[in-house]
Amino acid sequence: MAGESRWQAGRPTTAQVGGWVLAHCQQRFLQDDNGLLFPREWLKRQELPLLAEHGVGHWQGEPVYVLELDEPIELPGMAWAPLRQFMLHGDFDQFCMLGYASQIGIWARHNRFCGNCGTRMQAQDHERVMQCPQCGLHQYPRLSPSMIVLVTRGDEVLLARSPRFVPGVYSTLAGFVEAGESVEQCVVREVREEVGVEVANLEYIGSQNWPFPHSLMLGFHAEYVSGEIVPQEDEIEDAQWFSLDALPPLPAQRSIARHLIDLYLARRSGAAEPVLPG
């Protein structure tokens, strides 16, 4: 079928022979002139500081595994590339595969031992879970729900920048959902905390996996109600109202932050609405 993804997440068993493998460490992937996927049996014969191996899915019908390495060792003719590089450039199906593999690799690294009794954890075949054989504790891959919101005021949008951003880039507001609150409550609270304004008329737009390292971004538009911008100390370097015809440098095209902005621009101008990547 036209447009069908070449990547499908899954759990091919590590007991079977063959397939492709990704080498991962600290949100970086090993690559050579042929790419990121290596013949599995060949790469496993190299002297690698292996922590864990997990099946992660299928690429063009072939099983794919991830090797989580203890450190990013150097191998002749190969180099390590950061995950963010693949978000910004190149094949989106490939980025989805790498994002999933990175999250599984990090989960495997962080859950080698039981947090309750210290026993070495064991991966299970029937589902994606690490289980302690001593006390029975289960650990599933971590997923952190986060709201991300574009605050609007007619032909103006409220954008902010964190000290961690690329210089000059402004984006939407975002924050993690706390225990006991709904995503909608999180939107109102985070906007108030980060920039000191009140919002209403929330509209859910869509969601996007964000593997940096394990967020699920839940995107909203919200209308400004009241208040003056007061940036949160240590979190927000600057925040401003920007006219739609005079926007600052914006986030990457593939991000949900950029989609929220582009969607609002399209709606105000009557243009065709963009499709959220992923």
UniProtKB/Swiss-Prot annotation:
One of its GO terms (molecular function) is manganese ion binding. CDD domains: NUDIX_NADH_pyrophosphatase_Nudt13 (cd03429). A divalent metal cation 3 binds at residues 190, 194, 235. InterPro entries: NAD-cap_RNA_hydrolase_NudC (IPR050241), NADH_PPase-like_N (IPR015375), NudC-like_C (IPR049734), NUDIX_hydrolase-like_dom_sf (IPR015797), NUDIX_hydrolase_CS (IPR020084), NUDIX_hydrolase_dom (IPR000086), RNA_Hydrolase_NudC (IPR022925), Znr_NADH_PPase (IPR015376). A divalent metal cation 2 binds at residue 190. A motif (Nudix box) lies at residues 175-196. Its EC number is 3.6.1.-, 3.6.1.22. It catalyses: a 5'-end NAD(+)-phospho-ribonucleoside in mRNA + H2O = a 5'-end phospho-adenosine-phospho-ribonucleoside in mRNA + beta-nicotinamide D-ribonucleotide + 2 H(+); NAD(+) + H2O = beta-nicotinamide D-ribonucleotide + AMP + 2 H(+); NADH + H2O = reduced beta-nicotinamide D-ribonucleotide + AMP + 2 H(+). GO terms for biological process: NAD catabolic process; NADH metabolic process; NADP catabolic process. A divalent metal cation 1 binds at residues 174, 194, 235. Divalent metal cations. Mg(2+) or Mn(2+). NCBIfam families: PRK00241.1. mRNA decapping enzyme that specifically removes the nicotinamide adenine dinucleotide (NAD) cap from a subset of mRNAs by hydrolyzing the diphosphate linkage to produce nicotinamide mononucleotide (NMN) and 5' monophosphate mRNA. The NAD-cap is present at the 5'-end of some mRNAs and stabilizes RNA against 5'-processing. Has preference for mRNAs with a 5'-end purine. Catalyzes the hydrolysis of a broad range of dinucleotide pyrophosphates. Belongs to the Nudix hydrolase family. NudC subfamily. This is NAD-capped RNA hydrolase NudC. It comes from Pseudomonas aeruginosa (strain UCBPP-PA14). The lineage of its organism: Bacteria, Pseudomonadati, Pseudomonadota, Gammaproteobacteria, Pseudomonadales. The gene is nudC.
